[in-house]
């Protein structure tokens, strides 16, 4: 069966927002109006179509990006629902990587919020074209102009309204379309399915003319012909104006701002029109870069069915009916069921068992898919998030890897029975495969299973899934901080390992220079020996020895990070030297760093933002200071005060309850990992005593 939709008619986009901006409701309405959903699901009653895990329906937040296909005006929309809670930033990064465009949803009452900034920065990183939908315009206190201002102030983005609301709060009746210079008014019944064009109300005409002129001036800058005509006194036609706005969106010159209320069914169809008119098709974005699997040279893949197959796995989910599902974006080529694929990232073979087109919670089996498609594959064995799948025979490729932040919080889990132990192993392996920001390891000394994640909520939800989905009974320890260690100074260490008492002995001498590296540089090993002081075949033993001990640290058993080890000299013995002897020597040299390298304990520092009513400001700041917080600044947002601070993660456990109690539930906070920094000596002494 040939391709049914031209690739230029695809819109692969995501909906991104702060936690309560109404993102899931907006997605629900899109599915309803595009005819995919027969009943509107409300987050308020836990029935939203996209939020299909129990944990999401209860908490009213979106945890996993479900991918859905829908149609609007002959265009094919692949919608990726992204979570808005900061503990799930990884999901957002991962979906932005495979999107071509995005709709940023703002709460018309709050404007740009902390998580909006985070997600916006991530979208900047991946250069994702976006449009903005100011939602909840029916809420008391909603203010469109203020929201637009907050985009300019807080995101530093050029915001250009292409609509503004008619009426506000409970009297919201529609919007002014500044491209067509018409009013669009919705009937209150028929669930928002009926709307009509009217002339712009007389009392809004002056505002509309001014806003239209601002839009036109920004738009014609994108096109020389339009600019010339405009300077000559000619008003651009609707088609020319749309073409210019589209150009601006594709290069990020400005961001069109739309408005409405998804909950009250107003403004969603005009948002869909804007998605079709302004967001990119796969042909509008730069070709995808990759590395040739064999030659390791850079190659590009254009969005075309004729090019060799290249597919990126961006999400793995455990589905109760199908088993493990791998969500994939096809960048080039054609994929068919039964095909044999190469996982180029891991050099493993895979076979496509079933291929599914997902609609949030039901699925359609398909036999083939093309460039631009987002599909779910069942039956893959070794593929993980971020892996590339391709045709083993036609110029295999590795697409660029996704980068995932390191987890900062950990808890110990102990199964209650032998049966639980077995179930726990299987369940954790699946959860770790689904989510790269969640890692599982075993503490060799205590034998405990350690789970690491991005925040308390992140781990809470994993524990919840273990208990509910996998029926594992386990005891959960208190959360622990993922401390790290670093070197305080550069030091040369000369160590000789010698065991020569009859028979084959062991001999290895290493001279290694250890030095602190830049933050984020990781562990770097270098061999600078010139000549044959240590034969080449023994060098890997030196590196292996260091690799085997660095994660146990020097002070309290935490990994030593960001340092460089340079092998500068050494000695060997013709008979008694071996790879193992050099491994033992480098391990012993490493241990001498405890005395000689001035090691330091590091702790994760979180960027914390608290939004609080004025009357609790003193208590909030006092409390943050008592947690070793460093206040970075404060400003006003509406009638609330925003406090920004850096606070050690160790002092943030249980903060949500303290803040709630202190402000009678009116203050909110978000936090995310920012950097590691040395722990003050008196605190370090306590930590070392506890863990060493």
UniProtKB/Swiss-Prot annotation:
Q: Which InterPro entries match?
A: EF-G-like_DII, EFG_II, EFG_III, EFG_III/V, EFG_IV, EFG_V, EFG_V-like, G_TR_CS
> Pfam families, per this entry?
EF-G_D2, EFG_C, EFG_III, EFG_IV, GTP_EFTU
One cellular component (GO) term of this entry:
cytoplasm
Could you tell me the Gene Ontology terms of the biological process aspect for this record? Answer: ribosome disassembly
The answer, when asked if Thylakoid is one of the entry's keywords, is no
Q: Which residues form a coiled coil?
A: none
- Identify the keywords attached in UniProt to this record, alphabetized: Cytoplasm, Elongation factor, GTP-binding, Nucleotide-binding, Protein biosynthesis
Q: Which residues form the tr-type G domain?
A: 8-283
| Lineage: superkingdom | Bacteria
The UniProt annotation places GTP binding at 17-24, 81-85, 135-138
Q: Which GO terms describe its molecular function?
A: GTP binding; GTPase activity; translation elongation factor activity
Q: Provide the function of this protein.
A: Catalyzes the GTP-dependent ribosomal translocation step during translation elongation. During this step, the ribosome changes from the pre-translocational (PRE) to the post-translocational (POST) state as the newly formed A-site-bound peptidyl-tRNA and P-site-bound deacylated tRNA move to the P and E sites, respectively. Catalyzes the coordinated movement of the two tRNA molecules, the mRNA and conformational changes in the ribosome.
PANTHER family recorded for this chain? RIBOSOME-RELEASING FACTOR 2, MITOCHONDRIAL (PTHR43261:SF1), TRANSLATION ELONGATION FACTOR G-RELATED (PTHR43261)
Q: Spell out the protein name for this chain.
A: Elongation factor G
Q: Which lineage ranks, top first, belong to the organism behind this chain?
A: Bacteria, Pseudomonadati, Pseudomonadota, Alphaproteobacteria, Caulobacterales
């Amino acid at each position: 069966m040939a391709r049914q939709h031209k690739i230029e008619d695809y819109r692969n986009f995501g909906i991104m927002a702060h936690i309560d901006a109404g993102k899931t409701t907006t997605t629900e309405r899109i599915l309803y109006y595009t005819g995919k959903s027969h009943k509107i699901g409300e987050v308020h009653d836990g029935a939203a179509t996209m939020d299909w895990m129990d944990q999401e329906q209860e908490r009213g937040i979106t945890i996993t990006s479900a991918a859905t296909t829908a149609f609007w005006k002959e265009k094919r929309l692949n919608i990726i629902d992204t979570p808005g809670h900061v503990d799930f930033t990884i999901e957002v990064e991962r979906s932005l990587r495979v999107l071509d465009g995005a709709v940023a949803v703002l709460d018309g009452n709050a404007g740009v919020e902390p998580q909006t900034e985070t997600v916006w920065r991530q979208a900047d990183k991946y250069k994702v074209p976006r449009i903005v939908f100011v939602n909840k315009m029916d809420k008391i206190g909603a203010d469109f102009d203020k929201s637009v201002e907050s985009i300019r102030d807080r995101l530093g983005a050029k915001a250009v309204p292409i609509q503004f609301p008619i009426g506000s709060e409970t009297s919201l009746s529609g919007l002014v379309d500044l491209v067509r210079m018409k009013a669009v008014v919705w009937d209150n019944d028929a669930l928002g399915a009926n709307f009509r064009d009217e002339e712009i109300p007389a009392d809004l005409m002056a505002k509309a003319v001014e806003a239209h002129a601002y839009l036109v001036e920004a738009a014609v800058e994108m096109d020389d012909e339009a600019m010339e005509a405009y300077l000559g006194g000619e008003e651009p036609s609707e088609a020319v104006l749309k073409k210019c706005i589209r150009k601006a969106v594709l290069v990020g010159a400005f961001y069109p701002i739309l408005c409405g209320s998804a909950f009250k069914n107003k403004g969603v169809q005009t948002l869909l029109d804007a998605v079709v008119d302004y967001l990119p098709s796969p042909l509008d974005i730069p070709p995808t870069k990759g590395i040739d699997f064999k030659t390791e040279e850079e190659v590009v893949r254009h969005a075309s069915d004729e090019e060799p197959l290249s597919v990126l796995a961006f999400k793995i989910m455990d589905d109760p009916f199908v088993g493990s599902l791998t969500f994939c974006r096809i960048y080039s080529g054609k994929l068919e069921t039964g095909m044999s694929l190469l996982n180029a990232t891991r050099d493993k073979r895979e076979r496509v068992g079933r291929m599914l087109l997902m609609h949030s919670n039901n699925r359609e089996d398909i036999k083939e898919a093309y460039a631009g498609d987002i599909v779910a594959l069942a039956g893959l064995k070794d593929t993980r998030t971020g892996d590339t799948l391709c045709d083993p025979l036609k110029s295999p490729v590795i697409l660029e890897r996704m980068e995932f932040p390191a987890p900062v919080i950990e808890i110990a889990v102990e199964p209650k029975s032998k049966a639980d132990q077995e179930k726990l192993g299987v369940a954790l392996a699946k959860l770790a495969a689904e989510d790269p920001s969640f890692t599982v390891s075993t503490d060799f000394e205590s034998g405990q299973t350690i789970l690491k994640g991005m925040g308390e909520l992140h781990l809470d939800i994993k524990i919840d899934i273990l208990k509910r989905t996998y029926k594992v009974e386990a005891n959960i320890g208190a959360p622990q901080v993922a401390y790290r260690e670093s070197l305080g100074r550069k030091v040369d260490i000369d160590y000789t390992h010698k065991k020569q008492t009859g028979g084959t002995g062991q001999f290895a001498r290493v001279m290694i220079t250890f030095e602190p590296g830049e933050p984020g540089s990781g562990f770097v090993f270098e061999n600078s020996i010139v000549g044959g002081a240590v034969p080449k075949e023994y060098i890997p033993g030196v590196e292996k020895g260091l690799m085997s001990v660095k994660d146990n640290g020097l002070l309290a058993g935490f990994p030593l990070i960001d340092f460089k080890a340079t092998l500068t000299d050494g000695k060997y013995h013709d008979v008694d030297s071996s790879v193992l002897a050099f491994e033992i020597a480098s391990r012993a040299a490493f241990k001498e760093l405890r005395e000689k390298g001035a090691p330091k304990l590091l702790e994760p520092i979180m960027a914390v933002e608290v939004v609080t009513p004025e009357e609790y400001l003193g208590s909030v700041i006092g409390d943050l200071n008592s947690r070793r917080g460093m206040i970075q600044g404060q400003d006003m947002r509406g009638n609330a005060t925003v406090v920004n601070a850096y606070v050690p993660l160790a002092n943030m456990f249980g903060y949500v309850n303290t803040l709630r109690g202190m402000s009678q539930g009116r203050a909110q906070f978000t936090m995310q990992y920012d950097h590691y920094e040395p722990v003050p000596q008196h605190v370090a002494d306590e930590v070392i005593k506890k863990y060493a």
